[in-house]
């Protein structure tokens, strides 16, 4: 008999699954639902003469990062968000990257900035993330966004944890009083 943890729902209560049961979550179906809603939101913005635009910065030639960036741009364009890609060579200096970020921060036609991580080892990643204007920081990594999130304020939340919560809510319904564990190695 598995041990019981005080305070946690026990298997079989409130329709919970038995100890060894699992639920397969269809992430592709959930993503499709999100894309439909985002497309509606973008269409609504366009009716107000607002064209959402995302600037994506990729420094270096990391193959995994190139795939991530390509997929992000494709999804953005699929829902009507204009994408502007900035590919920088691996030997770009932190100062050059900061200049580009400052230019994008000042560009009123750009609504969001995504800096693809990791950066090459010689670059100051934290300084680059802090240079992105908090209201354009689509990954939610700026310290103002991280701090606001930890205080329960509405901010730009990081995509990965937001996606995890969305999947859990779609699968389990109301999460109040429930416990979930997400295992990962990043600061997201």
Where are these regions (language model features)?
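Short, well-structured alpha-helical segments in soluble
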Residues: 96-108
């Amino acid at each position: 008999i598995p041990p019981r943890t005080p305070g946690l729902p026990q298997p079989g209560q409130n329709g919970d699954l038995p100890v060894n049961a699992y639920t397969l979550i269809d992430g592709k179906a959930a993503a499709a639902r999100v894309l439909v809603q985002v497309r509606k939101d973008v269409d609504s913005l366009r009716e107000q003469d607002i064209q959402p635009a995302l600037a994506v910065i990729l420094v270096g030639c990391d193959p995994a990062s190139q795939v991530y960036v390509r997929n992000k741009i494709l999804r953005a364009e699929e829902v009507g968000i204009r994408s502007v890609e900035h590919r920088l060579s691996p030997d770009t200096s932190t100062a050059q990257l900061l200049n580009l970020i400052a230019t994008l921060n000042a560009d009123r036609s750009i609504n969001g900035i995504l800096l693809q991580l990791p950066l090459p080892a010689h670059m100051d990643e934290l300084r680059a993330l802090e240079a992105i204007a908090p209201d354009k920081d689509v990954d939610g990594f700026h310290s103002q966004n991280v701090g606001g999130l930890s205080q329960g304020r509405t901010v730009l939340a990081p995509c990965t944890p937001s996606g995890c919560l969305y999947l859990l809510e779609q699968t389990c319904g109301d999460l109040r009083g429930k416990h979930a564990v997400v295992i990962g190695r990043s600061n997201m």
